């Protein structure tokens, strides 16, 4: 269930209504009166949730889902348990997006509300520069200093003794104590998710949050996207440079450092004490082990074990990269060839 501090519930809705919204067909029309209250992922659903299944590799998750309903391709209906109503469509993700938008809406600043919402809670010693906007239900801890032009969305929690730079935007997020956010940083915007619908590409709703733990630094113009369902997490004492992008559902551990232009793709898990050189790129759904180092401009497409240093394109262990680079240098220079 999306966090009600950040998302308004528009439900419940009848299954027949959600099938129509997603341009899907109920496999069993008798289930059209089933009540659905929320959207959820396949493996974290309950009887009042609607989900989708589009990848046969996840058939085990489909077989064990507790969802009340699931958008599914015709050839995949048999993977669902009998308790889950099948909504048949050729585009399950796009259909689910339409249903999720019927059930949930991101909370935004109220039209005409004062810049400091009367329902926001500020502890003693909070310092606000000019032109700050703070939304309904936001909470800001003692001693926090907020720069000019900052926008803090409804429900956001900011701990004590934080420093928020000019024109930063923070939404759908919870920040710990002594967090430093530099100018122009954006926290909690929608992650990048899209699917092909009947009329072209559609955005997939992003119903998660951002959690930033104590003593984190986030550089200027860096972006941390909120999760698609769960949380995007930055661990304690992690330091992030300017112009870094952390995608949705990424989990970064404690005491990591990310240099400028680093990009970490969705759902990747980064252990503790990991270092990223400038312009490093990491593909989605990977695991970067604790104590690993990723070289500058490296492009990581595989899991990196604990404590290893990888670099290059595609990234590989440092010693292997050095051997290959030395060999290529010899070949390019003509040494080691005959004739």
From Swiss-Prot:
Pathway field: Bacterial outer membrane biogenesis; LPS lipid A biosynthesis
Any single biological process term in GO: lipid A biosynthetic process
Record EC number: 2.3.1.191
Catalytic function, reaction form: a UDP-3-O-[(3R)-3-hydroxyacyl]-alpha-D-glucosamine + a (3R)-hydroxyacyl-[ACP] = a UDP-2-N,3-O-bis[(3R)-3-hydroxyacyl]-alpha-D-glucosamine + holo-[ACP] + H(+)
Class of enzymatic activity (EC top level): transferase
Keyword Nucleotide-binding: no
Active-site residues (renumbered): 248
Record keywords: Acyltransferase, Lipid A biosynthesis, Lipid biosynthesis, Lipid metabolism, Repeat, Transferase
Stored InterPro entries: Hexapep, Hexapep_transf_CS, LpxD, Trimer_LpxA-like_sf, UDP_GlcNAc_AcTrfase_non-rep
Domain of life: Bacteria
PROSITE patterns: HEXAPEP_TRANSFERASES (PS00101)
GO CC, one annotated term: membrane
One example GO MF annotation: N-acyltransferase activity
Family statement: Belongs to the transferase hexapeptide repeat family. LpxD subfamily.
Assembly and oligomerization: Homotrimer.
Chain's role: Catalyzes the N-acylation of UDP-3-O-acylglucosamine using 3-hydroxyacyl-ACP as the acyl donor. Is involved in the biosynthesis of lipid A, a phosphorylated glycolipid that anchors the lipopolysaccharide to the outer membrane of the cell.
Name under which the protein is recorded: UDP-3-O-acylglucosamine N-acyltransferase
Taxon lineage: Bacteria, Pseudomonadati, Pseudomonadota, Alphaproteobacteria, Caulobacterales
């Amino acid at each position: 269930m999306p966090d009600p501090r950040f998302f308004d519930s528009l439900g419940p809705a009848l299954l027949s209504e959600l099938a129509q919204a997603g341009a899907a067909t109920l496999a069993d029309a008798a289930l059209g009166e089933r009540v659905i209250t929320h959207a959820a992922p396949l493996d974290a659903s309950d009887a009042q949730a609607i989900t989708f299944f589009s990848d046969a590799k996840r058939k085990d998750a489909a077989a064990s889902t507790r969802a009340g309903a699931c958008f599914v391709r015709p050839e995949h209906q048999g993977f669902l348990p009998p308790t889950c109503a099948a909504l048949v469509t050729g585009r399950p993700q796009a259909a689910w997006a339409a249903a999720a938008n019927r059930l949930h809406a991101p909370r935004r600043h109220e039209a005409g509300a004062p810049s400091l919402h009367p329902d926001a809670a500020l502890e003693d010693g909070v310092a606000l520069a000019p032109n700050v906007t703070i939304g309904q239900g936001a909470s800001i801890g003692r001693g926090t200093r907020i720069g000019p032009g900052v926008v803090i969305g409804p429900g956001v929690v900011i701990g004590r003794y934080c420093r928020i730079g000019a024109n930063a935007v923070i939404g759908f997020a919870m920040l710990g104590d002594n967090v430093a956010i530099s100018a122009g940083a954006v926290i909690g915007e929608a992650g990048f998710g899209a699917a092909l619908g009947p009329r072209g590409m559609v955005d997939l709703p992003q119903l998660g949050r951002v959690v930033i733990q104590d003593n984190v630094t986030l550089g200027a113009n860096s972006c941390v996207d909120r999760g698609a369902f769960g949380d995007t997490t930055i661990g304690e004492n992690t330091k992030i440079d300017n112009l870094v992008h952390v995608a949705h559902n990424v989990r970064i551990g404690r005491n990591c450092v990310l240099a400028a232009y680093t990009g970490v793709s969705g759902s990747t898990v980064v252990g503790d004490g990991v270092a990223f050189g400038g312009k490093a790129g990491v593909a989605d759904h990977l695991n970067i082990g604790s104590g690993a180092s990723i070289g500058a401009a490296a492009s990581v497409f595989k899991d990196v074990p604990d404590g290893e240093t990888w670099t290059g394109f595609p990234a590989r262990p440092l010693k292997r990269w050095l051997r290959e680079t030395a060999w290529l240098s010899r070949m390019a220079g003509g040494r080691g060839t005959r004739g």
